[in-house]
Regions:
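Extracellular/periplasmic envelope-modification machinery, especially enzymes
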Residues: 1-171
Length: 171
């Protein structure tokens, strides 16, 4: 897994991806298309590490430190970026509170921890998006990305069907 301070980037890095490996699945294609259009991509993705402060997931307690480093990088940007955020949002219900030593616990592959309130995880995610916008960045949230075990067509169709009452019509 790549430390955010060693983030992969190319071109003008006017676009940034942030999130866990779900967001990372977008990097190859985005990078290719952006370079063809004279732009570039910086990837701040990290396995099992969505863009939320003070929480961690799976066996990645260092996620707390990863997000601090992401913020340090973001605060160093000299110009507005197009920031794409995505994650396996299912894991928000399995967030854990920060440990006392996230980097050491990460090296030890710690997987147990004190369960966080899912609403607090979502609040942190929302607050991060609001902060990015307040800094002047263009934020694009991609939700949801189907897992490899899901039928994407059925999943998206069910989402549209569930939203139908909120619209005058569906195209």
């Amino acid at each position: 897994m790549r430390d955010p301070y060693d983030a992969c980037s190319n071109g003008d890095s006017s676009w940034v991806t942030i999130g866990d490996s779900y967001a990372g699945t977008l990097d190859f294609y985005l990078s290719k298309v952006l370079l063809e259009k004279g732009h570039g991509l910086m990837s701040l993705t990290y396995e099992q590490c969505p863009f939320v402060n003070d929480f961690w997931f799976g066996n990645v307690p260092e996620c707390v430190e990863v997000n601090k480093r992401r913020w340090n990088i973001i605060k160093s940007f000299k110009e507005r970026k197009n920031i794409i955020i995505s994650a396996n949002y299912y894991f928000f219900r399995e967030g854990k509170l920060a440990t006392n030593n996230p980097l050491e616990d990460g090296r030890n592959n710690l997987s147990y921890g004190i369960r966080a309130n899912e609403d607090e995880v979502w609040h942190s995610f929302s607050k991060n998006i609001e902060t990015l916008q307040a800094l002047g960045h263009n934020v694009i949230v991609i939700y949801p990305i189907p897992s490899v075990t899901e039928d994407a067509k059925k999943m998206y169709l069910s989402l549209i069907t569930d939203l139908k009452p909120q619209f005058d019509g569906i195209i």
